[in-house]
UniProtKB/Swiss-Prot annotation:
Residues binding ATP, per UniProt: 560-562, 655, 698, 700, 703, 721, 755-756, 835-837, 928, 934, 957-958
Gene: DRS2
Protein name per the record: Phospholipid-transporting ATPase DRS2
Region span, Involved in autoinhibition: 1-104, 1231-1309
Pfam families, per the entry: Cation_ATPase, PhoLip_ATPase_C, PhoLip_ATPase_N
TM ranges: 222-242, 247-267, 450-470, 491-511, 1013-1033, 1044-1064, 1095-1115, 1132-1152, 1162-1182, 1203-1223
Record's bilayer topology term: Multi-pass membrane protein
Outcome recorded upon mutating R1228A: Abolishes ATPase activity and leads to cold sensitivity
């Protein structure tokens, strides 16, 4: 298989298939016999041991069998015996030298390992007598089925390490990456397996648990500098005689903030936990020894060593070794799109020795064990050994089916669970749910530091001023006892006092307000019916609400293909036969016409059928050959359903679509036998059987597949299908008259993103075939370079072909994908598609979904070595630099890079080159990439640029990519929920990204930006008056306002305007945001939030605070503030005036920045002022008498009873806000932003003439595309490349009867049964041979014989 990803190591010639030559671990095996020794070179004379192996060491197998076995068990499972310098480890899996037969020595453990083992032993009970531990003895008891029921409880109760690993870390006690001792799994012995403490099948995607919530939550909250700042302030307030305010005001407010944040985090994590619970409670069928049958259990209850039954279309619940299946020789088909993104089905096959276990009775009698590698993250390797009846059977990736795969085209399989839960390879490739911080939050943290610097400056000015004033006026202020005061101590005390006094410049309610805003924004996103997918009853779910504003600033989208952009459903769309193009439904503008002697457009499939059935039509023989090729030249297996229909089992979805297309056109493939295929001609009811002589299989080098048939009339024909490039060069130069028309049709297909194949044939004489067949057979039996020699043999016969036509298959897209991608690109978002599929497939999808277009130049990087990749990248960079590309030119570039080249390009020395080329392209497609490479690509762009990234996928193979991006979006698909559970946002369809980003993203970013800026502004506007006041009170640290009133400012009186703006404000309507995607660039450019904008708001707050302080102090200092009784206002009355005026100004500012007034806006802005005006007299009347706030005693009559107070509340706010109003007027009238213009259009419902211009430009572009020379012809074909397809299809005889669930039912139909002499006439009377695995029943003992000549065995 031409694949850049990790593949399992191949065995060297001459290596034995067994994992051990001597079975140390089989408790049923006797070691008695002649005295023998095993050295570490016993298995293979060519084996070169690693440096740490001691070649001289041997084990005497006959000295003391029991002691030897105990020693091996001790080293293998417990690693406690380190008295000797070397501990033997049976079957240690070494990644450097794949020699599973060897017995290896490992280095003695280091200090830390010994310490860890000491702890383990300390918490494990020991026997009073003998060297063996309590645990070891119970292991021996387990192997002899003598374990009492209380053992597991006692073991887990006292082994702290196992308890911690199992219930806290949810992992196995073995090595984290599979480098430790191999695990032993006993078949049909759950008690023995339970003793090892293997992980259960529980999975969790939550951020917290009971043990980690508090530390993780506090770490997350106090990583926000504002919360850390107020924690310090709260501590300072507790120092006696320092705080000018109440000591509990800050800590009380901080606790409220933390409690609200904690509640929000808990609610979101509970949602994740519920989602996990839904998956964990999925059901599977587990073989029960107690019931002698399969019983339904939850996934979470599946344990290592369980035998499970999986039916067709069901997901695999855990990493499983296939034991048997309903198909011949234990074959099964699995879909791994959820794991690696590949669309073609994979073929897995059980070992022949286990394929006989096909019913409950045989499973019950299955005894043995598996020695398996430890859990690890490698998706493409596996090593293990199964021991059955003293025979050791090697296990490889061919028998391993991973969790996350789905069983297809196979009625059922039986499997042995090897890894569960977080030990499965799928979960090993997943990372812990990361804690992500938004770009806005990072800016806030930096600006808080800057604001803190300003705060320090203000504190220093005030503290130094107080020291100077105290020193200079000490003699005049003798009553203050300032003489002899320690200046350093005074400075330090003043520093702390002013810290507390000015600390509210940083809004303490900022983050809780923002968190609540984001929570409700997330709720509104989830409530949007436009983002609800009715077909699967799936709403959009925001799992991490703290990231919603990131949706408005995305510059790159990294998307999976299969299941995200496409449905993974292939449909036969059109075909070209004899120069004519046929399609089922013809678009109005595509009807076939003749222009300049050339037929343009499509004909209907009905016309094709008419021509086929008209013997006088010259195209009839060609159409017959074309449809016969579709029905015969493939590796598909037909399967009759209960309703009489046929379901085609196809490893390649393309082949399935082609065969189905042929059936729809009247040539129905109905029977496959080992040496023939049968086709039903529906028009006449005639069945034609074609003898299958040879199959020349598809691979990525050949790009074609051929089959040779003997027709019913005795003639021999070769059918060939493949890429246009390879078919054209093999055509007969004289007998091909349809080439030009066919190529023209291929170009039309490619422009529509359809997957194309060329079809050709030739007649072969008997003599030529016999001569070639001898060459082919010789190549098929050679041991060296067999694949290359088979390809050479195929080349000899695949010549002088006659082109008969071409096919077009549509890889059906998800709804709305092309329109969504086009709109997102108009919004300035670059889209990268990362897929495990082949290059041709990826390019075709790029064309069909409008990621690529005909006028784009493809920059293809498909190299085999690092040096070639570097050279290719540098050549492209130099070429692009020479042309001095404009923006328009860059919009015509697309990069296509394959997985192998990408692996080289991701190296530190080359990644800058890759990113340079990629940034110049409008679109990037990475094909044949592994899940790890997907994540590495995202991390590279994330690390090398300041852009915000979004990753979207639907499969488990996309989880790492999703978690690596700033925002991860998972599609709640039909095949699994792993991506959706691990994502920040779960959606039902890719098309929902359009509104999610353009509307909700833009709204969220603008709302959050204004809410944050406003929060800082309002605190600056009020609390800076405290700083101005120090110049009037001799730097004494006296506060203008009462303590609790200051705290209530953020909690009650100004909290609602930013909240309402953050939740309900709309700067542009959703309709216009979707209509003009260019508005999205406002977020990408940081138009609403930046350092410059932030300090503009802060300075505005300084300005407003100065106006309030100066205005009020002039009024009160000069005695203008008289109440109705002619009494002058006091200090606290002046403070209330300052406070109330500031509240009115900041509420007025909120009114100016509000874009859309709603009922909530009216409640929030005027309502907040009204709330304060009502609250103050109640508070000032009650609390002083309760001895809580005596400052406000009698203040109400000095304020509410003064006309100057009310006049001040009118004049000063107008004076302060007039500048803001004039600035807003100037910007809109003379320097309008883009969204200002759109707002005017929205307000006055002004129509836009630009659509007509755009339509004209699109028309011009289409004309130019037609006039251009087209090169893309759309070849794509998905097919597994492991080889062996011919062998597989020759195993099948679909005339054999099958039961309800697809199992073989007749002795003559069993591929393992000896020939019992039943002829075709006896077939119906044959007695049932294989028991229905879904029902109990008796079965006679029978002898099986594999279709492999060299293997036979008994039940």
């Amino acid at each position: 298989m031409n694949d850049d990803r990790e593949t399992p190591p191949k065995r060297k010639p001459g290596e034995d298939d067994t994992l051990f030559d001597i079975d140390f671990l089989d408790d049923t095996t006797s070691h008695s016999g002649s005295r023998s020794k095993v050295t570490n070179s016993h298995a293979n004379a060519n084996y070169i041991p690693p440096s740490h192996v001691l070649p001289e060491e041997t084990i005497d197998l006959d000295a003391d069998d029991d002691n030897i076995e105990n020693d091996v068990h001790e080293n293998l499972f417990m690693s406690n015996n380190h008295d000797d310098q070397t501990s033997w480890n049976a079957n240690r899996f070494d990644s450097d030298a794949y020699q599973p037969q060897s017995l290896r020595a490992v280095k003695p453990p280091g200090l830390f390992a010994r310490f860890g083992n000491g702890l383990k032993n300390a918490f494990t009970f020991k026997r009073k007598k003998g060297p063996e531990s309590f645990e070891m003895n119970h292991y021996n008891a387990v192997t002899n089925n003598e374990l009492d029921d209380n053992y597991l409880d006692s073991r887990n109760k006292f082994n702290i390490k196992i308890l911690f690993n199992r219930y806290i870390l949810r992992k196995n006690v073995g090595d984290a990456e599979g480098n430790g001792e191999p695990r032993v799994i006993h078949i049909n012995d759950s008690l023995a397996n339970s003793s090892f403490g293997y992980s259960d099948n529980h999975i969790s995607t939550t951020k917290y648990n009971f043990a980690t919530f508090l530390p993780k939550f506090l770490f997350q909250e106090f990583s926000k500098y504002a919360n850390l700042f107020f924690l310090c302030t709260s501590a300072i307030q507790q120092v006696p005689h320092v705080s000018p305010t109440n000591r509990y005001t800050t800590i009380g407010t901080l606790l409220v903030v933390l409690i609200v944040s904690a509640m929000k985090e808990c609610i979101e994590d509970i949602k994740r936990a519920n989602s996990d619970k839904e998956l964990n409670n999925s059901t599977a069928e587990i073989f029960s020894e107690a019931h002698d049958d399969f019983v339904e259990k939850r996934w979470i209850d599946i344990r290592v060593g369980d035998i499970i039954r999986v039916k067709s279309e069901e997901p695999i619940p855990a990493d499983t070794i296939i034991l048997s299946s309903s198909e011949p020789e234990g074959l099964c088909y699995i879909e791994t799109a959820n794991l690696d993104g590949e669309t073609n089905l994979k073929i897995k096959q059980s070992r022949v020795e286990t394929a006989k276990f096909i019913d409950v009775k045989t499973l019950k009698n299955m005894n043995g064990k598996v020695v398996s590698e430890q859990p690890n993250s490698s998706l493409y390797t596996y090593e293990g050994t199964m021991t059955l009846n003293d025979r050791q059977i090697p296990l490889s990736p061919d028998q391993m089916i991973l969790r996350g795969a789905t069983l297809r085209n196979t009625a059922w399989i039986f499997g042995l669970v090897i890894f569960t839960g977080h030990e499965t390879k799928l979960l090993r490739n997943a990372t812990a749910t990361p804690i992500k911080r938004t770009a806005v939050e990072k800016i806030i943290n930096r600006q808080i530091i800057a604001l803190f610097t300003v705060l320090i400056v203000l504190i220093l000015i005030s503290s130094i001023g107080n020291v100077i004033m105290s020193t200079a006026d000490a003699k005049h202020l003798s009553y203050l006892y300032l003489e002899g005061t320690n200046k350093a101590g005074l400075f330090f005390k003043d520093f702390l006092t002013f810290w507390i006094l000015f600390s509210n410049l940083v809004p303490i309610s900022l983050f809780v307000t923002v968190e609540l805003i984001k929570y409700y924004q997330a709720f509104m996103i989830g409530s949007d019916l436009d983002l609800y997918y009715e077909k699967t009853d799936t709403p959009t779910v925001v799992r991490t609400s703290s990231l919603v504003e990131e949706l408005g600033q995305i510059e790159y989208i990294f998307s999976d293909k299969t299941g995200t952009l496409t449905r993974n459903i292939m449909e036969f769309k059109s075909c070209s036969i004899a120069g004519h193009c046929y399609i089922d439904k013809i678009p109005e503008d595509k009807t076939a016409t003749v222009e300049d002697g050339i037929e343009v457009g499509y004909r209907k499939f009905d016309d094709l059928k008419k021509k086929l059935n008209d013997p006088s039509d010259e195209d009839s023989p060609i159409i017959n050959d074309f449809l016969t090729l579709l029905a015969t030249c493939h590796t598909v297996i037909p399967e009759f359903q209960s309703d009489g229909s046929i379901k085609y089992q196809a490893a390649s979805p393309d082949e399935g679509a082609l065969v189905q297309g042929g059936a729809d056109l009247g040539y129905k493939f109905i029977i496959r036998k080992p040496n023939s295929v049968t086709v039903l001609l529906e028009e006449t009811g005639e069945e034609k059987e074609y003898q299958l002589l040879n199959i020349c299989e598809f691979n990525s080098t050949r790009k074609r597949m051929s089959a040779i048939f003997r027709f019913p009339d005795g003639s021999i024909k070769l059918f060939c299908k493949g890429a246009d490039t390879v078919i054209l060069e093999r055509l007969d130069d004289e007998a091909n008259q349809y080439v030009e028309a066919t190529m023209r049709h291929l170009e039309d297909y490619a422009s529509e993103g359809l997957r194309t194949l060329c079809l050709a044939m030739r007649d072969i004489s008997e003599g030529e075939y016999e001569e070639w067949n001898s060459i082919y057979n010789e190549a098929a039996t050679t041991l060296d370079n067999r694949a290359e020699k088979l390809d050479e043999a195929a080349n000899l016969i695949e010549k002088n072909l006659i082109l008969i036509g071409a096919t077009a298959i549509e890889d059906k897209l998800q709804d709305g994908v092309p329109e969504t991608i086009h709109t997102l690109q108009e919004a300035g978002i670059k889209i990268w598609v990362l897929t495990g599929d082949r290059q041709e497939t990826a390019i075709n999808i790029g064309m069909s979904c409008r990621l690529l277009s005909e006028d784009m130049n493809l920059l293809i990087i498909n190299e085999e070595t690092r040096d070639d990749t570097e050279r290719n990248l540098l050549e492209k960079i130099n070429a692009l630099n020479e042309h001095q590309l404009s923006t328009h030119d860059m919009n015509t570039l697309a990069l296509v890079i394959d997985g192998k080249s990408l692996g080289f390009a991701l190296e530190p020395e080359l990644e800058d080159y890759l990113l340079t080329v990629a940034k110049l392209c409008k679109a990037v497609i990475c094909c044949r990439v592994s899940p790890l490479q997907k994540a590495l690509v995202v991390k590279m762009v994330k690390r090398k640029s300041s852009s915000l990234l979004l990753a979207i996928g639907d499969g488990a193979n996309d989880v790492s990519m999703i978690q690596a991006a700033h925002v991860g979006v998972g599609i709640s698909g039909m095949e699994g929920m792993q991506a959706a559970r691990s994502a920040d946002i779960a959606v039902g369809q890719f098309k929902f990204l359009k509104k999610l980003l353009l509307v909700h993203g833009s709204w969220s970013y603008q709302r959050i930006s204004v809410a944050i800026l406003y929060s800082f502004y309002k605190n600056t506007a009020l609390y800076m008056t405290q700083f101005w006041y120090v110049f009037a009170n001799a730097f004494s640290g006296q506060s203008i306002m009462e303590s609790w009133t200051m705290s209530f400012y953020n909690l009650f009186f100004t909290v609602w305007p930013p909240f309402v703006i953050g939740v309900f404000d709309q700067f542009v309507s959703s309709r216009l945001l979707e209509r003009y995607p260019q508005l999205y660039k406002l977020g990408q450019k940081g138009q609403f939030f930046s350092v410059y904008i932030f300090w503009g708001w802060i300075i505005n707050g300084f300005f407003h605070s100065a106006i309030v302080f100066i205005g009020t102090i002039l009024i009160y200092r000069y005695g203008f503030a008289l109440n109705m009784h002619g009494e002058l206002a006091d200090h606290w009355s002046w403070g209330v005036t300052v406070y109330t005026t500031s509240v009115i100004i900041v509420l007025g500012k909120a009114a100016l920045v509000t874009n859309q007034w709603t009922k909530f806006t009216l409640i929030a802005i005027p309502g907040s002022l009204l709330f304060w005006l009502i609250f103050f007299p109640i508070y000032a009347s009650i609390f002083p008498h309760a001895n809580i706030s005596r400052e406000y005693y009698g203040v109400v009559k000095h304020t509410y009873g003064s006309g100057v107070f009310w006049l001040t509340l009118i004049v000063l706010p107008i004076f302060a806000l007039v500048r803001d109003f004039l600035w807003k007027y100037y910007k809109r009238m003379y320097e309008p932003e883009t969204y200002h213009v759109i707002q005017e259009m929205q307000k006055y419902n002004i129509s836009d003439s630009r659509p007509h211009v755009q339509q004209f430009q699109n028309a011009i572009r289409k004309v130019r595309q037609v006039q251009r020379m087209k090169k893309q012809r759309g070849f794509a074909f998905s097919q597994a490349e492991e080889g062996g397809q011919e062998k597989i299809v020759r195993m099948y005889d679909t005339t054999q009867k099958r039961g309800k669930y697809g199992e073989l039912q007749d002795a003559s139909a069993n591929p393992f049964n000896d020939n019992n002499g039943l002829g075709s006439n006896d077939f119906e009377s044959a007695e049932p041979f294989i028991e229905n695995p879904f029902a109990d029943g008796n079965q006679n003992s029978n002898r099986f014989s594999s279709s492999r000549d060299d293997i036979s065995f008994d039940i």
